[in-house]
Amino acid sequence: MFEINPVNNRIQDLTERTNVLRGYLDYDAKKERLEEVNAELEQPDVWNEPERAQALGKERSSLEAIVDTLDQMTQGLDDVSGLLELAVEADDEETFNEAVAELNTLEEKLAQLEFRRMFSGEYDSADCYLDIQAGSGGTEAQDWASMLLRMYLRWAEARGFKTEVIEESEGEVAGIKSATIKISGEYAYGWLRTETGVHRLVRKSPFDSGGRRHTSFSSAFVYPEVDDDIDIDINPADLRIDVYRASGAGGQHVNRTESAVRITHIPTGIVTQCQNDRSQHKNKDQAMKQMKAKLYELEMQKKNAEKQAMEDTKSDIGWGSQIRSYVLDDSRIKDLRTGVETRNTQAVLDGSLDQFIEASLKAGL
């Protein structure tokens, strides 16, 4: 004989949680907006403005993820209740197990939607840029920066995000001095925003013939791509624009033309650069887009005293602003903010970051 009371309790719990989310996420307004967006996308002239059409498509996906999930929860819980009644009437354990399996699936769906509640920031749904900067320490720090770059690229690709390397400056011997990547996809910035900070590596250096332990630092800085219609006043006189020859992998045209562009915002010292296109004009446009995004993020941080100022994040690559410690000899990676720790160091370096990211989001960092 199967126990029905615990299952009924779970159904009641999931129903209550679904109703809470329905109110919190403003289901009625989102459903109405989804109908409006669908109507706009059905207009034959919608693709006359490709950027507008793409924005609507992105908005539709975001709305559907909420509206459809809540609809599925309501219908699914009704279906499970019906299956449960059938199982009791027929004393059929197979039908009971089917109801429990369906309930497990619904619980997982709801948990994912509840997790998305944490993406409530203005730009959490935006695409984002990730800057990686090697700290002092020469080759060892530069190798660590390249390991971080690989880790984030692996994480993003595993989660289905699109990645693009905007700029990469190679180290003298190995690794990289710096890199900027763009990560595109739903809630890219929301997922990655708590990764800003200093990452500390402790290991026996492969570049030390004595095999001694070395401590290296590299920083990650995450900032959202901002909409073109946001007014950010940049005085052209405050900008220094340099062109240079691209370095690194890039085919036969690398180093032949000065197509790479570096822009410096003199009042703040913020630097953006792009070298991933053969066209200097396109690289300049991309670097300006990043500059706009960085200046916007700086303004937001100034308004929020709890966030670190961008200058600190970019300049203090040392003990002060550490977020995570990677001690490879002891097989231990620990997040210094949440206390989350794992001994599976290789999995983390291969992109298994969700446990750290989810804990930091749940902690409200």
UniProtKB/Swiss-Prot annotation:
<dbReference type="GO" id="GO:0016149">
    <property type="term" value="F:translation release factor activity, codon specific"/>
</dbReference>
<dbReference type="GO" id="GO:0075523">
    <property type="term" value="P:viral translational frameshifting"/>
</dbReference>
<feature type="modified residue" description="N5-methylglutamine">
    <location>
        <position position="252"/>
    </location>
</feature>
<dbReference type="InterPro" id="IPR045853">
    <property type="entry name" value="Pep_chain_release_fac_I_sf"/>
</dbReference>
<dbReference type="Pfam" id="PF00472">
    <property type="entry name" value="RF-1"/>
</dbReference>
<comment type="similarity">
    <text>Belongs to the prokaryotic/mitochondrial release factor family.</text>
</comment>
<dbReference type="InterPro" id="IPR000352">
    <property type="entry name" value="Pep_chain_release_fac_I"/>
</dbReference>
<keyword id="KW-0488">Methylation</keyword>
<dbReference type="GO" id="GO:0005737">
    <property type="term" value="C:cytoplasm"/>
</dbReference>
<dbReference type="Pfam" id="PF03462">
    <property type="entry name" value="PCRF"/>
</dbReference>
<comment type="function">
    <text>Peptide chain release factor 2 directs the termination of translation in response to the peptide chain termination codons UGA and UAA.</text>
</comment>
<dbReference type="InterPro" id="IPR004374">
    <property type="entry name" value="PrfB"/>
</dbReference>
<keyword id="KW-0648">Protein biosynthesis</keyword>
<dbReference type="InterPro" id="IPR005139">
    <property type="entry name" value="PCRF"/>
</dbReference>
<keyword id="KW-0963">Cytoplasm</keyword>
<protein>
    <recommendedName>
        <fullName>Peptide chain release factor 2</fullName>
    </recommendedName>
</protein>
